Amino acid sequence: MHAESFDTPLAARLADARHAPRAGEVVLYWLGQAGFVIDTPEARLLIDPYLSDSLAQKYRGTRFPHERMMPAPIAPHDFDRLDLVLCTHRHTDHMDPGTLQPLAERFTSLRFVVPEASLDEALRRTGASRERLIPVEAGQRVPLFDGCTVSPIASAHETLDTDEAGRHPWLGYVIELHGVRLYHSGDCVPYPQLHERVRQAAPDVALLPVNGRDATRSGNGVPGNFTLDEAVELARAAHIPALIAHHHGLFGFNTLAPEVIDARIDDEREHGALSIHRAQTGCAWHIGASTPRRARMGE
């Protein structure tokens, strides 16, 4: 993988054929929080896009007002094409009606991958018809289109939960695109089986939240995620060559300072084997399927 900086608006970048992914290549762009564009020559995917101010409107005047620290890098109506959206769970910064409904209206064939446990909520939040939703559950391997599958892994959003039918409301996704495997954990903390489940999936890159957790946030309805140390440990234990650290920089009460992440990047570059990247806008991460897995993620 190599990272490429750019200074054009993301919408213009995505619409410019000169920057289209090459055959066998996957290109990632960060949307803020846990959101990413996953671009390939065959299809364009989004995962956990939060591109509105839904939460600022909902929580205005409360202890945690959810005011943005950064603007959305693109508006829903500015995408020139889109084929699939994946939502890891029902929380609004991952399944946002202010983002999903405009996308569903603009792209009438757009489909949505959602946890089966939250299907009813997903129907309300997307505003899409039932046939446009693809409900998934941990342990499945679901074909999405030619050369692309998603394999959900249960996530623990502080707790490893199931509903009355035994279905997991919090999921991570292993997304395979023509030989490139991405693991996006959704919101997650460590639990005993996680490292082995992820290791067996053999991802090339992990997209992991690093905003951590504490009693103040969880006690006020804001369950947390991996610490940076825990995210690094998961990537190492699962033998993942590279990590993009995200879920920071959007809400002031629920973030990690960029200099803390950058210091860990520098330390790992000097003393370790893991390639760590801090999610940031104005950056494209290129992953090529033709390169051997261990070499693929080098700087």
Residue ranges with predicted function:
Residues 1-67, 237, 272:
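Zn-dependent metallo-beta-lactamase
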Residues 2-23, 114-180, 264-298:
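Metallo-beta-lactamase
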Residues 14-19, 43-90, 98-102, 160, ...:
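Pre-active-site segment of Zn-dependent metallo-hydrolases
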Residues 34-39, 143-204, 222, 226:
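Catalytic core of the metallo-beta-lactamase
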Residues 38, 48, 89, 96, ...:
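Divalent metal-coordination and catalytic microenvironments
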Residues 54, 91-95, 119-121, 140-143, ...:
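Active-site environment of divalent metal-dependent phosphoester hydrolases
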Residues 54-60, 73-142:
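Active-site HxH/HxHxD metal-binding segment of metal-dependent hydrolases
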Residues 111-113, 117, 189-281:
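Cap/insert and terminal regions of metallo-dependent hydrolase folds
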